[in-house]
């Protein structure tokens, strides 16, 4: 007898450390040796799953490459990834009806934006007597368990979050590799395949009406999706981590940011689950223990050596019971700041990289061309849009980043935007640590190599002027081949003026909130060191306008 099971991929686009896959390979019978399993691995393009509601060309391409990599692996095993287009509940109902499915397995999507879909699927399974198995593997800990352990309320500070997960204990280690020896792969009958729009080959972004809109800019860094590439990249990243540990520091991509690349970030692979976050976490921690065991200098370990992963967990936990987490007015943890309405072309100029500030513009053009930005550059551009410059809502920036970033993740992306704009996770309406794009540009890119890569119109400007080209005389601008205001825009705001104005506005709002007693349950950093690490503030010069 053969048992038909479905493995439904949403995130978690991998075979390694995939407890849902292991569950789908089980027949659930007492005598499993007499029961063969027929596996149907599927993905459904429903316009929502894997963040496809708001998606640009680069991220859709990365997703499709990740699915193609999965498909290649399944084909090597004698099967294939079945990719459908349609409503998830409708597709699953028809598969249940026609294929005699006994079990549906999938990885938990913990964010509230997926709750309606998953509740409907769970109800369908109950109605049709299909066993539904959901596993936690996209996060290190189950966010619901974290909240329950904290007294059924989300931890309002990062330190409170650390305290809570320390009570729970270390995250689980990765599960073992799947055994496909006795597994048969299922096929979908032709009529049903046609009805459910089963893709005969892996689609391209253009098949979804998503076309490249990088304005013919050159993508200098190529990102390729898929588990195979992610595991290769992990090896390179671990070498970087080991070097840092041997030199006595950690978080190398944050401690010594390299904005010119090649980038060693794993964020896109983690976002789509091409790489297991548990594997990454434990590889780094085991490596740290190994280095320390052979070193005469002992450094404290703990969660901070994978701090960026822990912040990811924190943002997931803060969002899991908050369906309005990605907006301002209905969000209970977000301060309602009276941002300007984008009535002129300010927002468009920021999006297109035409602000007149070279570091901002280079970063925004890199985002359009490649779909990725270093964490530091995200902070600079986000601060400029909100409290550090244009005074426009973080919600506008969030929607732009969600569309174009390869690693755009609703919980993490929204959390970062709220922090940078001082709307949440920051000290109450504090603009004292407000990154200046010019001062930080000089520190990050002293020769202007990054700016010149993405702003070729400034290629002939010397380091003296490349971050402030308007300070060159007109004769010099002509000599450099780019007159400011003609081939490259003049600064759209006076930073000295807007920084003081914004800081004054923040201070006034803070007084009103405190005096009026209307402060919301405001998430905040535990200490100044968290702020300095997040914004990469090594000295006060980087905060001056």
Curated annotation (Swiss-Prot):
GO cellular component, one term: cytoplasm
InterPro entries in the record: Crypto/Photolyase_FAD-like_sf (IPR036134), Crypto/Photolyase_N_sf (IPR036155), Cryptochr/Photolyase_FAD-bd (IPR005101), Cryptochrome/DNA_photolyase_1 (IPR002081), DNA_photolyase_1_CS_C (IPR018394), DNA_photolyase_N (IPR006050), Rossmann-like_a/b/a_fold (IPR014729)
PROSITE patterns: DNA_PHOTOLYASES_1_1, PHR_CRY_ALPHA_BETA
Keyword DNA-binding: no
Keywords from the named record: Biological rhythms, Chromophore, Cytoplasm, FAD, Flavoprotein, Nucleotide-binding, Nucleus, Photoreceptor protein, Receptor, Repressor, Sensory transduction, Transcription, Transcription regulation
KW Manganese (keyword) present: no
Location of the Photolyase/cryptochrome alpha/beta domain: 3-140
SUPFAM superfamilies, sorted: Cryptochrome/photolyase FAD-binding domain, Cryptochrome/photolyase, N-terminal domain
Binding residues for FAD: 237, 265, 267, 308, 375, 407-409, 413, 416
Main location: cytoplasm
Entry's Gene Ontology molecular function annotations: blue light photoreceptor activity; DNA binding; FAD binding; flavin adenine dinucleotide binding
One Pfam family this sequence matches: DNA_photolyase
Cofactor binding mode and count: Binds 1 FAD per subunit.
Cofactor(s) required for function per UniProt: FAD
Gene3D superfamilies associated with the record: 1.25.40.80, DNA Cyclobutane Dipyrimidine Photolyase, subunit A, domain 3, HUPs
Compartments where located: Cytoplasm; Cytoplasm, Perinuclear region; Nucleus
GO BP annotations listed: circadian regulation of gene expression; entrainment of circadian clock by photoperiod; negative regulation of DNA-templated transcription; nucleobase-containing compound metabolic process; regulation of circadian rhythm; response to stress
Family named by the database record: Belongs to the DNA photolyase class-1 family.
Physiological role: Blue light-dependent regulator that is the input of the circadian feedback loop. Has no photolyase activity for cyclobutane pyrimidine dimers or 6-4 photoproducts. Regulation of expression by light suggests a role in photoreception for locomotor activity rhythms. Functions, together with per, as a transcriptional repressor required for the oscillation of peripheral circadian clocks and for the correct specification of clock cells. Genes directly activated by the transcription factors Clock (Clk) and cycle (cyc) are repressed by cry.
Subunit structure: Interacts with tim and per; promoted by light conditions.
Written domain comment of the UniProt record: FAD-binding region regulates cry stability, cry-tim interaction, and circadian photosensitivity.
Name of the protein in question: Cryptochrome-1
Top-level taxonomy: Eukaryota, Metazoa, Ecdysozoa, Arthropoda, Hexapoda
């Amino acid at each position: 007898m053969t048992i038909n099971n479905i493995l439904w991929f949403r995130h978690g686009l991998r075979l390694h450390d995939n407890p849902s896959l292991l569950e789908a390979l089980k027949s659930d019978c007492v005598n499993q040796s007499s029961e063969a399993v027929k596996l149907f691995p599927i993905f459904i393009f429903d316009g929502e799953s894997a963040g496809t509601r708001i998606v640009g060309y680069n991220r859709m391409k990365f997703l499709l490459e990740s699915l193609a990599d999965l498909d290649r692996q399944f084909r090597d095993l004698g099967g294939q990834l079945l990719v459908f287009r349609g409503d998830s509940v409708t597709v699953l109902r028809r598969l249940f009806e026609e294929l005699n499915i006994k079990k549906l397995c999938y990885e938990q999507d913990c964010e509230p934006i997926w709750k309606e879909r998953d509740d409907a699927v769970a109800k369908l399974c109950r109605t049709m007597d299909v066993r539904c198995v959901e596993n936690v593997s996209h996060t290190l800990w189950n966010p619901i368990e974290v909240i329950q352990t904290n007294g059924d309320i989300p931890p309002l500070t990062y330190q409170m979050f650390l305290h809570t997960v320390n009570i729970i204990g270390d995250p689980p280690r990765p599960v073992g590799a799947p055994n496909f020896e006795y597994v048969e792969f299922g096929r979908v009958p032709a009529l049903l395949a046609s009805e459910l729009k089963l893709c005969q080959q892996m689609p391209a972004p253009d098949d979804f009406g998503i076309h490249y809109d990088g304005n013919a800019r050159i993508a200098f860094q190529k990102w390729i999706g898929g588990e195979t590439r992610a595991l290769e990249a992990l090896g390179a990243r671990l070498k970087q981590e080991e070097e840092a540990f041997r030199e006595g520091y950690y978080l190398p991509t944050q401690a010594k940011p390299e904005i010119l690349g090649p980038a060693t970030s794993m964020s896109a692979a983690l976002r789509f689950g091409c790489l297991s976050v548990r594997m990454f976490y434990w590889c780094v921690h085991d490596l740290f223990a190994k280095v320390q065991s052979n070193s005469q200098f002992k450094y404290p370990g703990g969660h901070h050596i994978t701090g960026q992963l822990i912040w990811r967990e924190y943002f997931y936990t803060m969002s899991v019971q908050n369906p309005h987490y990605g907006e301002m007015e209905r969000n209970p943890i977000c301060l309602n700041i009276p941002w300007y309405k984008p009535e002129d072309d300010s927002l468009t100029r920021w999006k297109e990289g035409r602000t007149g500030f070279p570091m901002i513009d280079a970063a925004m053009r890199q985002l359009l061309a490649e779909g990725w930005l270093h964490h530091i550059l995200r902070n600079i551009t986000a601060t400029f849009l909100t409290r550090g410059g244009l005074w426009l809502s973080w919600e506008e920036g969030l929607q732009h980043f969600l569309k174009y970033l390869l690693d755009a993740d609703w919980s993490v992306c929204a959390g970062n935007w709220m922090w940078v704009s001082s709307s949440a996770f920051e000290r109450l309406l504090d603009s004292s640590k407000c990154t200046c794009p010019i001062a930080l540009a000089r520190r990050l890119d002293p020769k202007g190599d990054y700016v010149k890569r993405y702003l070729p119109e400034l290629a002939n400007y010397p380091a003296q002027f490349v971050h402030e080209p308007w300070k060159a005389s007109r004769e010099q601008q002509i000599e450099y081949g780019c007159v400011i205001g003609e081939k490259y825009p003049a600064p759209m705001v006076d930073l000295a003026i807007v920084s003081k104005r914004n800081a004054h506005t923040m201070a006034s709002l803070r007084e009103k909130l405190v005096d009026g007693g209307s402060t919301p349950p405001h998430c905040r950093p535990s200490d100044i060191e968290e702020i300095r690490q997040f914004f990469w503030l090594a000295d006060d010069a980087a905060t001056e306008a």
